[in-house]
Curated annotation (Swiss-Prot):
Keyword terms, alphabetized: Cell membrane, Membrane, Transmembrane, Transmembrane helix
HAMAP family in UniProt: UPF0182 (MF_01600)
Stored Pfam families: UPF0182
Main location: membrane
InterPro entries, per the entry: UPF0182
Listed name of the protein: UPF0182 protein bll7333
Entry's localization field: Cell membrane
Transmembrane segments: 17-37, 65-85, 134-154, 185-205, 220-240, 264-284, 297-317
Cellular component, GO annotation: plasma membrane
Length: 927
């Protein structure tokens, strides 16, 4: 007995030291966590204040705080209540019984020792601490859903009802997600309460669990029954919410509520609500009865009912009743799915028009569509990116991240151009130059941009550059007065500006040019307290120790376009491709942003996307020099955007106040267009019978690529639509029938005002064969002349590169096909545009330039305008020297017209020359 008592006493100092270390570690962890939270808060507050969105910051912080406190309080109260009840009831048991029951499973340790330890614990404080800690974890997770609850509170009506329950669609977009979160939290809180109480009962011996005995006291049964009843009550509500989730089901035929769901699934859910209510009442009744059988029966009632009513019966009903007459029974539900999917993605706004595919092109037609011809894109992304890198990166630390297609009015004409910003990547500096000063103080910004027309090339096959060099030189392109790029796609680290040393600006010969920042970007960091804050935030003591930082210095953070926009508006989904715009001598980034939801009723989810509703409601403009961010609301009819505008009334500006020059550069975003095009492959079919049988399913065209077969990507193009008076900027993509290669339609999105955002699909006659891109590629590969030339180049040590897309060019009611061909040395990295391949009708040609290709294409028999029959009735005369001279003169004039791009003049002179030559030929035969 003496040994058992004195042993622990001798170990007490060591145990106290261990406890002290544990407490110290916990205190340090808590302090470090609070410091990290405080630094994040202060940095965010400073940053939001500087860029002018302090109201957004406080609204977001306030919403997170309210959700956190509400969830923490509710969870803690529930856990505390159950913990204290368990403690109150458990103390009625004898301490000796408690000790014996617990320690019997641990090897029959002395029961008096456990009783001593248990009795010395301050259980109320321990329960309070445990409840608060568990609630903290739950609340921290739920605080991230602040946007869902704000949308619930500020929701805007959609203005249309779902056809099954007649609820406004806004209920599904804004209320249902909040209800599901609340339901899930209630289930979690009840489950944690049960575990929390069970732990207390176990320690106090109310629950016995060993190899000889498994039992629990009547008190535990009563408490557990009360919680089980609450769980069944929440489950009843969950089944009620499941009625609405039927609108998101997918049985393979239709997305949304099907015939089986409405006639079997919905009644089954009502029955499950009733059974769950009965189970809840039975569980609560067991608080007095205190038996195992009643809760077990309640649980089996719900479990078996759910399996039979929600699982087995619908499967049997679908298999033996619905499947034999599936189309007839599912017809109204297929029609709902078609209508609501088209509505969710704005597919119902696509205007369908016929395209005759007459193939009646002539020189006169080409001349009438000169803007289209002059903007056929011959420079593909990758070859042009390689060329830019070789010719214009100038130093290893400059990088062209991505090339973009845009349009500008240059020299009085509407031109499609490729443009890319010359950004700075300090990580590409030599290894011995990878210093903190270089990364954060000296090499702070990129410089200028490169721009080239999509069609023109030099005599060496290189792009003609409208913008080039450092500092930027404009040769036909827009002037850049402020070329420095502090914010872009490559910038992922902070920099210090307005320091004690000038920043590297650009290289000039053997020397460098330096400059000092003179803008408003960045957060002030001159004060010691702010230097300490950012040093802790970035875990970088150099910010505190560096002598380069002065009282006027500013630190630029979040310089990446995507990160910058997401930090301000995390509820917006961003397009993958922000693009550079030069306006009034300054450089801006234009970022498309989407409002999305995955709760639009009965709508097909987008492929590989967690959404079934999307709108391009917001355009974001970021100043490349100052980093200012402006959000412009494009779609005032979007209820999701309207809801966020209610939440953040000063975040969005009307699109009408966007500078007019920037408005001219908005374009239809490719990500949205792809989603819509993918869905339109099926959802252009509006008749339920046709949709069910997939009779008219479309797909994207195939084309050779990457050593195999790839899917054609959409492309931007300037062209004039049939019946329109002027050329416009479009995003377009051809379509082909499923498992076929002939073209069936082409989809286009208009990018210019006043018709921005309107989608048009031009459908070809089903009885007429129109070659698709893959078929034209096959014809190109079958051309002996082209194949021989490509083989010859490959044998001469050059690598032939085909264009990524064979461009389908609609002109009037005809289709022209164009693809470039590049040459690159076997071990070189400088592609040259060497040939242009053009196809029209049955003819395929390859020439050095587009003009020559079109000239050759339309001089083939059958492709030119037919010669007037009056030619044969002209009086016969002998060919003379004057006729030969006139024919030669006509030829020379035709060549001049061709070089100047005057297709109409070329056609006139060529036809006149042909008439002369035919006349001379006839008279020679007569002789």
């Amino acid at each position: 007995m003496t040994i058992g008592i004195t042993g622990p006493e001798r170990k007490a100092p060591r145990q106290s030291a261990v406890v002290g270390l544990i407490i110290a570690a916990l205190v340090i962890a808590i302090v470090l966590t609070l410091l990290a939270l405080a630094s994040d808060f202060l940095v965010d507050w400073l940053w939001f204040s500087v860029i002018g969105y302090r109201e957004v910051f406080w609204t977001t912080i306030g919403a997170k705080a309210v959700v956190f406190l509400a969830v923490w309080t509710a969870t803690a109260v529930i856990l505390l209540l159950n913990g204290w009840l368990a403690l109150h009831f458990a103390r009625r048991r004898s301490t000796q019984l408690a000790a014996a029951s617990v320690w019997s499973a641990a090897g029959n340790a002395p029961p008096d020792l456990l009783a001593l330890v248990r009795d010395r614990l301050r259980w109320p404080r321990l329960i309070a601490a445990g409840a608060a800690s568990l609630a903290l974890l739950v609340a921290a997770a739920e605080a991230g859903n602040w946007g869902v609850f704000l949308q619930f509170v500020y929701q805007a009506p959609y203005g249309a009802d779902d056809p099954l329950y007649n609820n406004d669609i806004g209920f599904y977009l804004f209320s249902l997600p909040a209800y599901i979160l609340i339901k899930n939290w209630m289930m979690l809180a009840l489950a944690l309460s049960a575990l929390f109480a069970a732990a207390i009962y176990l320690v106090h011996g109310e629950i016995e669990y060993d190899i000889h005995r498994r039992s629990m006291s009547s008190t535990v049964i009563a408490h557990g029954s009360a919680l089980l009843g609450l769980l069944f009550a929440v489950k009843a509500w969950s089944f009620g919410l499941d009625r609405y989730l039927l609108l998101y089901g997918d049985n393979g035929v239709v997305v949304g509520a099907s015939y089986t769901d409405v006639h079997v699934g919905l009644p089954a859910l009502w029955l499950m609500i009733g059974l769950s209510g009965i189970a809840a009442l039975a569980a609560w009744a067991n608080v007095r009865v205190r038996t195992y059988r009643l809760p077990a029966a309640a649980f089996l009632l719900v479990a078996i009912g759910s399996f039979v009513l929600s699982g087995l019966v619908p499967v049997l009903f679908r298999q033996f009743f619905v499947r034999p007459s599936e189309l007839e029974l599912e017809r109204p539900y297929i029609e709902r799915n078609i209508a609501l999917t088209r509505q969710a993605y704005n597919l119902d706004q696509i205007a369908a028009k016929p395209f005759a595919a007459e193939q009646k092109l002539s020189f006169k037609t080409l001349d009438a569509n000169k803007a289209t011809i002059d903007n056929i894109r011959l420079w593909d992304w990758q070859p042009l990116a390689d060329t830019y890198a070789q010719l214009q990166e100038i130093r290893t630390y400059y990088k062209f991240h991505h090339l973009d297609v845009d349009r500008y009015w240059l020299n009085g004409s509407y031109q499609s151009v490729m443009i890319s910003a010359r950004e700075l990547r300090p990580s590409l500096l030599p290894p011995n130059a990878q210093t903190w000063v270089n990364h954060h103080v000296l090499f702070t910004h990129g410089t200028g941009a490169v721009m080239s027309p999509v069609t023109r090339k030099s005599s060496e096959g290189l792009p003609f550059l409208y913008l080039r060099d450092i500092p930027p030189v404009a040769d036909g392109g827009p002037q850049i007065r402020e070329p420095r790029i502090y914010y872009g796609e490559e910038h992922d680290s902070y920099v210090i500006v307005k320091g004690s040393t000038p920043e590297f600006d650009y290289p000039k010969g053997k020397d460098n040019v330096y400059a000092a920042y003179d803008g408003t970007g960045g957060v002030p960091i001159g004060a010691a307290v702010w230097r300490g804050l950012f040093a802790y935030y970035f875990n970088d003591p150099n910010l505190l120790l560096s002598s380069y930082i002065t009282a006027d210095s500013r630190i630029m953070i979040r310089r990446n376009i995507g990160e910058r926009v997401r930090t301000i508006a995390p509820f917006l989904r961003l397009d993958h491709d922000p693009y550079l715009v030069i306006s009034n001598g300054r450089m801006f980034w234009m970022q498309d942003a989407y409002t999305v939801s995955s709760y639009f009723p009965s709508a097909q989810p987008a492929q590989d996307q967690d959404l079934n509703y999307i709108r391009n409601s917001v355009k974001v403009i970021v100043d490349a020099y100052n980093g200012t961010v402006d959000f412009y609301l494009m779609d005032t009819g979007d209820p999701v955007a309207a809801t966020w505008r209610r939440i953040f009334p000063n975040l969005f500006k009307p699109f009408s106040v966007m500078p007019a020059d920037l408005q001219r550069h908005i374009r239809y975003p490719e990500d949205l267009f792809l989603i819509q095009a993918q869905l339109y492959q099926s959802y252009h079919m509006e008749a339920a019978d046709v949709f069910y049988n997939r009779e008219d399913l479309w797909q994207f065209p195939r084309q050779p690529g990457g050593g195999g077969v790839a899917t054609m990507a959409p492309y931007y193009i300037i062209m004039r639509l049939p019946g329109e008076s002027q050329a416009e900027f479009f995003l377009m993509l051809p379509m082909v029938p499923s498992r076929r290669d002939n073209m069936i339609a082409w989809l286009a999105a208009r990018c210019d005002a006043p018709d921005y955002g309107k989608l048009i699909v031009y459908e070809f006659p089903k009885e007429k064969l129109v070659y698709g891109p893959f078929q034209i590629e096959a014809r190109i590969n079958q051309s002996t002349e082209i194949s021989q030339q490509i083989t010859l180049w490959n044998q001469m040590g050059s690598r032939v590169i085909r264009g990524a897309n064979l461009l389908v060019i609609p002109i009037e009611n005809s289709i022209l096909y164009v693809t470039p061909l590049y040459l690159r040395a076997e071990h070189g990295h400088l592609p040259e545009l060497k040939r242009v391949i053009a196809a029209y009708g049955e003819h395929v040609v390859m020439k050095e330039t587009l003009d020559e290709a079109l000239s050759a294409l339309f001089t083939e028999p059958g492709a030119v305008r037919p010669v007037s029959s009056t030619m044969e009735e002209m009086p016969v005369t002998r060919p003379s020297a004057s006729q030969a001279r006139e024919a030669l003169d006509r030829y020379n004039q035709a060549v001049e017209r061709l070089r100047s791009g005057d297709w109409k003049g070329f056609g006139t002179q060529f036809d006149a020359m042909r008439e002369l030559l035919e006349d001379m030929n006839r008279h020679s035969a007569d002789r």
